[in-house]
Amino acid sequence: MGFVLFSQLPSFLLVSTLLLFLVISHSCRAQNSQQDYLDAHNTARADVGVEPLTWDDQVAAYAQNYASQLAADCNLVHSHGQYGENLAEGSGDFMTAAKAVEMWVDEKQYYDHDSNTCAQGQVCGHYTQVVWRNSVRVGCARVQCNNGGYVVSCNYDPPGNYRGESPY
């Protein structure tokens, strides 16, 4: 009887390891779903009274394609394409959908809506794109770079951040 249990131990370990991998893998993907991107964006938009974004598969395909191009070195260079664009880079599980959008939304502290300006020496254009009232569709992608880091690209249709225009 003891021999039978011992002979089944390798199978048990294999199955247990596979299940653990699936749980971890699912957990990582679950933190980077379309809904995760939408929730993070739309919370920021609701805070300033802007209508929610909707997910657009065509915009997401553009984001995926461009993020894949950036994977060689994770160097954040904008595509200058037809969509508005926010990029983020980070390592490991830190760079999730929610974390990327949180980084952009954190720029709100530097944005003065009354004067429609950013504090001197600060960046707030990522935030203003997130809440740009005329941007109604979004698509995002997260890709692992060759250096082990991750790049997140979110694209917005129509684009925002027009000079002299207020985002909301």
Swiss-Prot record:
The keyword Disulfide bond applies. It is found in: Vacuole. GO terms for cellular component: extracellular space; vacuole. Induction: Synthesized during pathogen infection or other stress-related responses. Keywords: Disulfide bond, Pathogenesis-related protein, Plant defense, Signal, Vacuole. Pfam families: CAP. Three disulfide bonds are present. Residues 1-30 form the signal peptide. InterPro entries: Allrgn_V5/Tpx1_CS, CAP_dom, CAP_sf, CRISP-related, V5_allergen-like. Probably involved in the defense reaction of plants against pathogens. Belongs to the CRISP family. This is Pathogenesis-related protein 1A.
